[in-house]
């Protein structure tokens, strides 16, 4: 298969290099189009107010001065002279669990591939690495990815489906298997952090993500905690269909006494 690989950690991140190598070793034709620097948290942002520069690093790699969404959009609308068969985004250097997906550039790169008509997978490693501990197990996540891509080749999923894959940070031999999950969610984020710059002005840092809230059985949080690879099918239609009837009644009450023109 012709695989387009992107990420949000940047073109030089270890995860994307290990993923691309693993896919090539599995027999796929791989093109990497990724941001020139870390663009974590970029979500679905698309650059519209300035031109975007893309630098070809080698025959199989482009570095783009833009967001993850920019990278996939450019690759599929003119940068490449062929059409890939699938988009694989990752390997992210931390998990994208629950409502992380709203902010994730990793997931958004896959989502852009789906917007433009291709099957898409986002792969994240739920890292446990701390100073002095074992290095992150990117090879485990890469092994999961090549198996998922192989299955998609022979057994495609519905056209509106994106797979959000979160892999525990353990060796493949320690893994308990795959588990299909739903997104959990977190408590409210911690307060922003304030500091004072050298000129005396207050500056702000976004605070840490909130702790797990909805993280019980069936969620992506629970699967990873129990050493399963979490596969969550997501899609881009944000309509809350269960609320349509209730909101229709609410809107009827809202408009009941308004003098609309006939």
Curated annotation (Swiss-Prot):
Cofactor comment text: Binds 1 divalent metal cation per subunit.
Cellular component, GO, one term: cytoplasm
Coiled coil: none
Keywords for the protein's UniProt record, in alphabetical order: Cytoplasm, Hydrolase, Metal-binding, Nucleotide-binding
Cofactor names: a divalent metal cation
Compartments, record wording: Cytoplasm
InterPro entries (UniProt xref): SurE, SurE-like_Pase/nucleotidase, SurE-like_sf
Catalysed conversion reaction: a ribonucleoside 5'-phosphate + H2O = a ribonucleoside + phosphate
A Pfam family hit: SurE
GO molecular function annotations of the record: 3'-nucleotidase activity; 5'-nucleotidase activity; exopolyphosphatase activity; identical protein binding; metal ion binding; nucleotide binding
Domain of life: Bacteria
Assigned EC number: 3.1.3.5
NCBIfam families: PRK00346.1-3 (NF001489), PRK00346.1-4 (NF001490), surE (TIGR00087)
Family per similarity comment: Belongs to the SurE nucleotidase family.
Name of the protein in question: 5'-nucleotidase SurE
Lineage: Bacteria, Pseudomonadati, Pseudomonadota, Gammaproteobacteria, Lysobacterales
């Amino acid at each position: 298969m012709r695989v387009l690989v992107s990420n949000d950690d940047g073109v030089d991140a270890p995860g994307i290099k290990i993923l691309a190598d693993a896919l090539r070793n599995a027999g796929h034709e791989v093109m990497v189009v990724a941001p020139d620097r870390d663009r974590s948290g970029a979500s679905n942002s698309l650059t519209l107010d300035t031109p975007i520069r893309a630098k070809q690093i080698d025959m199989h790699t482009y570095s783009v001065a833009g967001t993850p969404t920019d990278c996939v959009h450019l690759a599929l609308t003119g940068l490449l002279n062929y059409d890939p068969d699938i988009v694989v985004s990752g390997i992210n250097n931390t998990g994208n669990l629950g409502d992380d997906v709203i902010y994730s550039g990793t997931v958004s790169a896959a989502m852009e591939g789906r917007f433009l008509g291709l099957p898409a997978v986002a792969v994240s490693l739920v890292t446990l690495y701390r100073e002095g501990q074992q290095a992150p197990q990117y090879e485990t996540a890469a092994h999961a990815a090549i198996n998922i891509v192989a299955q998609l080749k022979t057994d495609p999923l519905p056209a509106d489906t994106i797979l959000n894959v979160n892999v525990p940070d353990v060796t493949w031999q320690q893994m308990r298997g795959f588990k299909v999950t739903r997104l959990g969610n977190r408590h409210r984020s911690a307060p922003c952090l304030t500091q004072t710059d050298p000129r005396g002005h207050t500056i702000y840092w976004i605070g840490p993500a909130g702790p797990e809230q909805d993280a019980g059985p069936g969620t992506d949080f629970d699967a990873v905690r129990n050493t399963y690879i979490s596969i969550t099918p997501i899609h881009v239609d944000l309509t809350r269909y269960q609320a349509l009837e209730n909101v229709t009644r609410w809107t009827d009450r809202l408009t009941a006494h308004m003098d609309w023109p006939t």
